[in-house]
Amino acid sequence: MSLKFLTPTGVQSAASGTVERWSQDAYVALLLRVGLGVVFVIGGWSKLSQLLDPARSDAIVALYTGPTGYINTFFLEYLFGVGSWLSPWGFLTTLSTFEFISGVALLAGFMVRPLALFYGFLLWTFVFSLPVVLTPGVAVAEKTYLAPALLVQIRDITLSGLMFILFNLGSGAYSLDARLMGSAVKRPTANWEHLGLLLRLSLAATLLVGGFFAGMANIKTFGMPALLMIAAGVAMLVDHRAARVASGVLIAMLLIYILGKISFEKSLIGNLNAVKREFALLAAGLVLAIRGGGELYTVPSIMNRAREALAVSRRQLAAHPLRFRVTVPAMILLLA
């Protein structure tokens, strides 16, 4: 005899809803793992192919440690200054090897939580270490970054947010971790209202920075109109239905941008490296379209809760007017 007939209907319904959420979160984890894993596989492969080629290794080291690279003077001296055993080539080769291997691990779903937590913080170091010149009146002899590092690297901040979402979700059912560790990682139980908010904030950050600062130096706009980016970013923050529409706009923008970056003069890895971050953004856009961004932290929901709280306060005032008359003056005296 089936046990479901012995289970109260409400419990059956709740269990069914929980199983559905587990299934959805498993697909969300898979999409994020693939999108983020591709970024690091491509990035690691691209750098290693140059670092391990004697004819090209000096050029890429000079690129990464130069004025248009990713390491400013402060960190160059810290990492490779007097007394340091590190060399720029050795540092970049080690980092690129780890980048490639960790990308493969994310794709396979192996050690996902530790990697996601590590990268969630590491991606912020690309902001701290970026060489920028922002002092008014200073003549810049060589081409470098002329915008605040946080704005230049806003896509990496978005990727950091995605990593923290993945850390909370775990590997998901479709992963090597699930095969090795069993049910402990097959059923993510994270609160999607919170993670959906982080997803919307992360994606909106890239869109709003691109929209509001379009035309300024080193700002990524994907070649899209500023007003379109602003509208999509605001929509993601305001309402859960509007966020889903905005996710469709983001996906279309990214696909157009990726296709437009294809060049037959570049190698396959060169083409992929030019749009590697966009693959993660594309995966996040798909997650938002499929799973949504939650309803709790949206403007309509917040306004409804505020109205309900105000209505409760009014009812309490009507029921206990004397208590209110005594309490409010006492509070005023305490604050005076």
Which positions does each model-derived feature cover?
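Extended, low-polarity transmembrane helix blocks
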Residues: 2-101, 108-232, 237-336
